Each structure stands twice: as structure tokens, then as C-alpha cells.
């Protein structure tokens, strides 16, 4: 999921 990318990389 793309949402997980920004969520983890915040």
C-alpha cells in the first residue's frame, strides 16, 4: 500500500 510508505517514512 502506498499509504504505508508515507506512514513509515514519516
Curated annotation (Swiss-Prot):
Give yes or no: UniProt keyword Calcium: yes
UniProt entry keywords in alphabetical sequence: Aminopeptidase, Calcium, Hydrolase, Magnesium, Protease
- Name this polypeptide is given: Aminopeptidase
Biological process (GO) annotations held by this record are: proteolysis
- Cite the pH-dependence comment: Optimum pH is 7.5.
Q: Which cofactor does it need?
A: Mg(2+); Ca(2+)
Signal peptide interval: none
Its EC number(s): 3.4.11.-
- Give the top-level enzyme category: hydrolase
- Organism from which the protein derives: Capnocytophaga gingivalis
Known function:
Aminopeptidase which hydrolyzes substrates with free N-terminal amino acid residues but not N-terminal blocked ones. May be important in the nutrition and pathogenesis of the organism in the human oral cavity.
Coiled coil regions, renumbered to chain: none
The molecular function GO annotations come to: aminopeptidase activity
Amino acid at each position: 500500500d502506498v499509504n504505508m510508505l508515507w506512514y513509515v517514512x514519516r
